[in-house]
Curated annotation (Swiss-Prot):
GO terms for biological process: intracellular signal transduction; protein ubiquitination. ANK repeats lie at residues 13-42, 46-75, 80-109, 116-145, 149-178, 180-208, 213-242. It comes from Homo sapiens (Human). Residues 265-318 form the SOCS box domain. The SOCS box domain mediates the interaction with the Elongin BC complex, an adapter module in different E3 ubiquitin-protein ligase complexes. This is Ankyrin repeat and SOCS box protein 7. Pfam families: Ank_2 (PF12796), SOCS_box (PF07525). Keywords: ANK repeat, Repeat, Ubl conjugation pathway. Gene3D superfamilies: Ankyrin repeat-containing domain, SOCS box. GO terms for cellular component: cytosol.
Amino acid sequence: MLHHHCRRNPELQEELQIQAAVAAGDVHTVRKMLEQGYSPNGRDANGWTLLHFSAARGKERCVRVFLEHGADPTVKDLIGGFTALHYAAMHGRARIARLMLESEYRSDIINAKSNDGWTPLHVAAHYGRDSFVRLLLEFKAEVDPLSDKGTTPLQLAIIRERSSCVKILLDHNANIDIQNGFLLRYAVIKSNHSYCRMFLQRGADTNLGRLEDGQTPLHLSALRDDVLCARMLYNYGADTNTRNYEGQTPLAVSISISGSSRPCLDFLQEVTRQPRNLQDLCRIKIRQCIGLQNLKLLDELPIAKVMKDYLKHKFDDI
């Protein structure tokens, strides 16, 4: 049936022929058909061009030929409004992406948004394509673009537990306090102590509360009875007197769960009774004054190594 239909529809026959050539990596046939006038920008029922097809399949040489013959990488498909660069990001095709990013269309595709507002960086972070994330940032992709739901690539990397992508994005100054401190609160809620420590070391604000209820990370630690998170948060400057929208401090939240002795409750009672020592107050203030972007430059400060280690919390028993 298909063969009979193809004989009656030369255009469909050509489309299937060049798609088969791309799938097989037959660059000779691809080039020959293009030179005979076949358009690289024709679209199938899903809105895919041959550039979408070859990028998704990982056919680098075909991508190069299509670009040489006028393929347009700004075209979005009908599935989700994705460009060929989005599909390259999805499959981690960094070399193919470089070809497109080195073209005249770079500025039009590097931050192109899908129907849901996802850029190629969102896609790469979601799928954990760390080399692709590096490539996009090398070409100056916007590091904190917002999707239609207000989500950044860093948030997607956190939610999907793409640790390498998280570190790369933070190294490129992604906003660690996005959505009023979402990242640190998420790490606390998930009891992900390694993420919690990483965000704190990089200067995440310990006292930002959720917009809906005012719960800070320390409140959430109390709710989860997570004494390790509570200790880390306190050491990095969490305020034990901050109140949520119901007027509760973290200690009050902990007591409301159960008045009996528990590790987190005992800890919060202890630190709430005793003021911080001057040394710790100075450390908190110095880190705040240095600022988020400069914390990674602590090693360059003209101070003793023991002081640098102290500012980095290397002596904390957590």
